Curated annotation (Swiss-Prot):
This is Dihydroxy-acid dehydratase. It comes from Solidesulfovibrio magneticus (strain ATCC 700980 / DSM 13731 / RS-1). Its cofactor is [2Fe-2S] cluster; Mg(2+). The lineage of its organism: Bacteria, Pseudomonadati, Thermodesulfobacteriota, Desulfovibrionia, Desulfovibrionales. Pfam families: ILV_EDD_C, ILVD_EDD_N. Mg(2+) binds at residues 78, 120-121, 443.
């Protein structure tokens, strides 16, 4: 056993003394020691209930003959960090989470791990650690929040973000805004649409590192507790069979995950997180792969913000297995890949008798589109690529040309949008918000929501070297690479330059002569930013571009 490194033999007598201090018995020490990574806290709605999930996981481990040992990691709520300086720290936390798990599981060599995340950066951070350590492991999330309800129907947190702009233009009153904010988030769980947290939870199930149901069983359901107990038992079986994360994550299962990403209409943040996760296994995932898979994968689901359905609707419609069964019928999935059940994907789908139970939620017969939810754009404005959630773009904005309105920060753009300075036809450009330039690549949910709330969602595009919340909708194009801080073309744009967006043609161009653009370079002055945080200064010096998943540079790499 790996744990023998700190519990077995004469020389480990002092170590056992410390384990006795925990209250462990000799029998508990003899058993496999399983690390339970718990990101519970009292700050994040998606994590407030994770101690309940952790207790269920521990019960499952004990049922199967193991000894659980819990340790914590941080978890940031992107909603609470949005639209202020706190958002600089969100993406940074992904790397901190992965590193902290590596530290704990190396200093204390557990035999296996069960990881319990739920929200945006915690899921990829834990997946990165699982593949980096490559010891038997299962991920079991806290589950999605139920949608909010009023007398007018269901809604979610994004409706509240958009309501700010509606209030500013007089479309709703203060009482209506208050009703929305008090009812949008009815309880624990990751926010109820196909935003980043739920996207990553669904994809952790799709790639095989999470058990069936991990992505969609609601946080408040007893099924979620039973799933957690099962995860605790399953990790013991994986340990016995020596099935490790890199046995599950292969080139085939990566293609499965990206295919599911496109079919589900997931968050554009998956284009940052999946490459970062799979890089830990030495498996490349490029923007070209995303786009190639998107072109051949139908968009079967439009959950909020792209449509009217929520994660609990998807669960009732058959969940991730139902979507996978439909894609399998089309020959779009590899069914021979191993999963955390100890069986192949094909065996899982057969055992589950996976089928679609609601063809309005999962459009298997009449897909929303013949292409996937995400498109990769390139052109003179984004030579290394940019990302758009095309499934959440209005048809009228799939092609758009308009004058640039350029801002060097999110705050400046927000002020202009809410101040009525942005007009129909404009292209809002927000730069110096990339991984290095931000630093931390803040999410532009407030600007995109304010564009919607101000009634400009079908006439205004937004382009940024920052990123978006999974709750963003509209012609919102992010991850523009190279970013402004690296001297990318986005740094050379001026107010009034014509910007051409062609999503079907996968093009993003600034309609200025290349020689003229280059001549501007000498006069470009980056905004002066005083970065007081040593952590953010370190991050800015180490992080790669968004096109490479915004991972750290490897000092050993040539």
């Amino acid at each position: 056993m790996r744990s023998s490194l700190f519990k077995s033999g004469l020389e480990k007598a002092p170590h056992r003394s410390l384990l006795y201090a925990l209250g462990l018995t000799k029998e508990e020490m003899r058993r496999p020691l399983i690390g339970v990574v718990n990101s519970a806290n009292e700050v994040v709605p998606g994590h407030i209930h994770l101690n309940t999930i952790a207790e269920a996981v521990k019960a499952g481990i004990r049922l199967a003959g193991g000894t659980p040992m819990t340790f914590p990691v941080i978890g940031v709520c992107d909603g609470l960090a949005m639209n202020h300086a706190g958002m600089h720290f969100s993406l940074v936390s992904r790397e901190i989470i992965a590193d902290s798990i590596e530290i704990m599981a190396s200093a204390h060599p557990f035999d296996a791990l069960v990881c319990i995340p739920n929200c945006d950066k915690v899921v990829p951070g834990m997946l990165m650690a699982m593949l980096r350590l490559n010891i038997p492991a299962v991920i079991v999330s806290g589950g999605p929040m139920l949608a909010g309800t009023t007398s007018e129907g269901s809604f979610d947190l994004i409706d509240v973000f958009e309501a700010v702009g509606k209030f500013k233009r007089g479309a709703i009153n203060e009482d209506q805004l208050e009703e929305l904010e008090e009812n949008a988030c009815p309880g624990c769980g990751s926010c109820s649409g196909m935003f980043t947290a739920n996207s990553m939870n669904c994809l952790s199930e799709s790639v095989g590192l999470g058990l069936p149901g991990n992505g969609t069983i609601p946080a408040v359901s007893a099924k979620r507790v039973r799933l957690a107990k099962t995860a605790g038992m399953r990790v013991m079986d994986l340990l016995e069979k020596n099935i490790r994360p890199r046995d599950i994550v292969t080139a085939k299962s990566i293609e499965n995950a990206v295919t599911m990403d496109m079919a589900l209409g997931c968050s554009t943040n998956t284009v940052l997180h999946l490459p970062a996760v799979f890089a830990e296994a030495g498996l490349p995932l490029t923007l070209d792969i995303f786009d190639a898979v998107s072109r051949k994968t139908p968009n079967l689901c439009k959950l909020s913000p792209a449509g009217k359905h929520y994660l609990d609707d998807l669960e009732r419609a058959g969940g991730i297995p139902a979507v996978m069964s439909e894609l399998a019928k089309r020959g779009l999935l590899h069914l021979d890949v191993m999963t955390a059940t100890g069986k192949t994907l094909g065996e899982n789908l057969t055992d589950l008798k996976a089928r679609v139970k609601n063809f309005d939620v999962i459009r298997a017969k009449e897909p929303y589109a013949n292409e996937g939810g995400i498109a990769i754009l390139r052109g003179s404005l984004a030579p290394d690529g940019a990302v758009v959630k095309q499934s959440a773009v209005a048809p009228a904005m799939m092609r758009h040309t308009g004058p640039a309105r350029v801002f060097d920060s999110e705050e400046a753009a927000n002020k202009a949008i809410l101040g009525g300075e942005i007009k129909a036809g404009d292209v809002v450009v927000i730069r110096y918000e990339g991984p290095q330039g931000g630093p931390g690549m803040r999410e532009m949910l407030s600007p995109t929501s304010n564009i919607m709330g101000m009634g400009l969602g079908e006439t205004v595009a937004l382009i940024t070297d920052g990123r978006f919340s999974g709750g963003t909708r509209g012609a919102a194009i992010g991850h523009v690479s190279p970013e402004a801080a690296e001297g990318g073309p986005i740094a050379l744009i001026r107010d009034g330059d014509r910007i051409e967006v062609d999503i079907p043609g996968r093009k993003l161009d600034v309609l200025v002569d290349a020689a003229e653009l280059e001549a501007r370079r000498a006069s470009v002055v980056a905004p002066e930013k005083v970065i007081e945080s040593p952590l953010l200064r370190r991050y800015a010096s180490l992080v790669k571009s968004a096109a490479q998943g915004a991972v750290y540079k490897d000092p050993a790499a040539k």
